[in-house]
Amino acid sequence: MLLETCWEALERSRIDPTTLRASHTGVYMGAISQDYGPSMGEATEGLEGYLVTGGAASVISGRVAYTLGLEGPAVTVDTACSSSLVSLHLACQALRQQECSLALAGGVTVMADPGIFVEFSRQRGLAADGRCKAFSAAADGTGWAEGAGVLVLERLSDARRNGRRILGLVRGGAVNQDGASNGITAPNGPSQERVIRQALEAAGLEPAEVDAVEAHGTGTTLGDPIEAQALLSTYGRGRSTDSPLRVGTVKSNIGHSGAAAGVAGVIKMVEALRHRTLPRSLHIDEPSPHVDWSDGTVRLLRESEPWPRTERPARAAVSSFGISGTNAHVLLEEADSDDAVWGEPSEEGAAASAVALPEVPWLLSGHGREALRDQARGLYEWLGDAPEIEPADVGLSLAVTRARFEHRAAVVGRDRRELLEGLDALASGELASNVVRGTAAGDRHPVVLLLTGQGSQRAGMGGELYDAFPAFAAAFDEVRAHIDPLLDRPLGEVVFAPEGSLEAESLDRTGYTQPALFAFEVAMCRLLRQWGVVPSYLLGHSIGEVAAAHVAGVLSLPDACALVAARGRLMDALPEGGAMVALQAPEEAVTASLSGRDGVGIAAVNGPRATVVSGDHAPVAEVARHWRDQGVRVSELRVSHAFHSYRMDPMLKEFQRVAEGLTWHAPEIPVVSNVTGEVLTAQEATDPEYWVRQVREAVRFGDGVRWLRENGVGTLMEVGPHAVLASMAMECLAETDTSTGVVALQHGDHPETRTLVTGLAEAHSRGVDLDWASLFPTAERVDLPTYPFQRQHYWLTGQPRTSGATVPEARPDTDTETTEPEPPLDLSGMGPAEREEAVLDLVLRHTARVLGYSGPEEVEENRGFMDTGMDSLAGVRLRTSLSQATGLELSTTAAFDYPTPATLAGHITQRLDGAASTEADPSLSGLDRLESALESGSLGEAARERLRERLNALLTRLDATQPDPKGADLDNATDDELLDLIDKEFGIS
């Protein structure tokens, strides 16, 4: 309950809770020890090790801090009924003393056991009807309530600087104790008066400057008169009759919530200040006759009334008095009218773009598909009741004030109607053209930008983006300023010419095609950079690699423009002719088919079965005919020249002369080479000869994609004017990889802004981070529904406890029967894919069992074990369970070394494959022993260093063509001799 309330409090403060991880945020929570669950001496298997941390009130604040990753003070306060108000006071002190930068303060009460009802009934402290009739003649005891309340606190200066919506101010407060009074549980009037005066002094206020008091007001015949007299003595005297102190208590509305009572009163008064209304207290048909109400100017709020207007800020006080004698009093003040609204649009966002986003994305996420749908449904209903909220404000608020979980979706629309239709489809699980869905990987993976080559150009490309996004326009204009003097006509006249015009036809001339693509892609990369897309790699195709080189910092913009203009001009000046053909066949087979044919060669290897040949018409036609006869798909490319063939040779010398006149730099962002299919080295990038080879040699795009896949990239984003490379990349990945995503940010003649925003939303759904605030420069933050938690109860079930009885395990509210232990894992006869799937299923089942989930379907394979709530004890149990199921000796830290079910399953599969190899070759068993020792952490640093030296020596001998005698002795050693040697050398037992 408290975790959810803390999360919701942060969301309502427009703070994404995940952004507070590792921050100096404090947690101050009031909580009273509760009796739910067995005692420590009664625990059985399944509960031992969790009773203290799971049942002790002292752990509550720490658990909040642990779950959210907060590193400020975490303090649980138990002063009985005053716990949460004392927590608020301590949190304010910590903020003033710089112990934390933000604080969560509040309290929680859950009465899971009837003991407190029985005890107070024996003391005649409970009202017969369960209602608190505070300060009423009918008062006959208190009435209990349960719940939680949390406040988000920040220093006023920080809150203003961070653009927070400020709901109210804490002017000051005080805490004291009754001391040796007339009974530890009896209220003490003088102590209450002292704490009120101390709080007023701390706040720098006079009693008459406070308009109302939220009283402790429990409804008891002893406590109410004492508290009323304290209020009369402190606040009631010296006031004019037209400015009485208004007194009320929220306990008459909701009951006495124990440790959460104080924060309930604060929440009530903050809302009262915001709405400038003093709410009535219930059940006061007649004021208590045990109080001399004429002793001061005090008025009970028997009816709601407007907050009195004065020339000073409205103020209220809140009292909370613990049964143990700890008293707290806090002074509140209304927020300044300028602070009580959401912050203005950020200067950074406003400077980055002068116009609003033409297409609005609404981003949603959840820990599961049901949560995602529930969030869409809740938002749809919420907005149905709030037609005044602007779509862009919703978009900004979703993007920057809500956490981003694994299951993601985005709704894209130009207006409110279209966006709501998409929300409705998402909530219903239906497909819609403006809804994208995806699952973000548990770990963040690198992003790659793909820069397209010739063939992707189209008339008017970038025109809509130019008008919509000033950053794109500025970058495009900057390129034009450098490249126009090098062209026969201004680039803009060609690129933005109406389709079908003579100028537009020039776009297909190489001399203009290459500069146009360069300008478009540089502008796109600049726009993406503004929106927070920072690529880990760049991969271009032909001229796209030159654009990538500039984006990576290899060439300045003037030098890059000079190279691009020369490249296009020199190619365009070559005699027209030649041909290019795309074949749906592997490179090796195509190479073989070229044997004996002159004037034709491979121009590009775009995938495992995507090869392009280029050269003279006749031999190219022969090759095409050969492959058609074999039933292979053949596509003739519409080109003016046979690029990447010997027909480019006449331009190379002049092109090299231009390249040698430029200044080259090592890449700041890794560029994957078209020539080698691997990352471009600094030596290659700065060598003009490389860029000459890049013109002439085959484009090894498929090899580049394979290299990226092998190096763990997550998402490939194509930034060209048409989706060309995206489809090639998908073909490269289709057979071997389902984890890498491909996104095209433009699709030919589709609306450019719509396609771009949808592409960004799709990338986001795959886990790509963007600075979404920069996409909403004019929007403001608004209230939205909080996260739809998917609650499931795990009650302790069983018969009432007797001496010696066993403790029932915590089980979910399902009808699932207890299952028998499953047989050991048997992978015999399975292929590699089946083995991986079987092991993953095993890990998911055992994880669900250890965590108490109802089934493996509740476990996300790419979600971190830590995020599921797994602690070290559960991690060891998972390791033990999986070791028994697989027969492997897994490390006790396996769940943390391999932090997701998917990575742990991959490790186990690899170990099982190694075990199978060991059965086939027993000499490898010694290595298995060594691997287990390394994983267990039993080797000291000295032993590890000796191990490195010894293994390096072994590898040297293994690679040697003639093993030396010592190596031969080692090769001939038996398993036992090898193990004895390892044991003796490294102390492995």
Question: Predicted regions span which residues?
Answer:
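Short, low-complexity connector segments at domain boundaries
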Residues: 7-26, 370-371, 377-464, 525-526, ...
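Acyltransferase loading domain of fatty acid and polyketide assembly lines
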Residues: 206-207, 252, 284-287, 316-318, ...
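Flexible, low-complexity segments
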Residues: 308, 479, 516-538, 583-584, ...
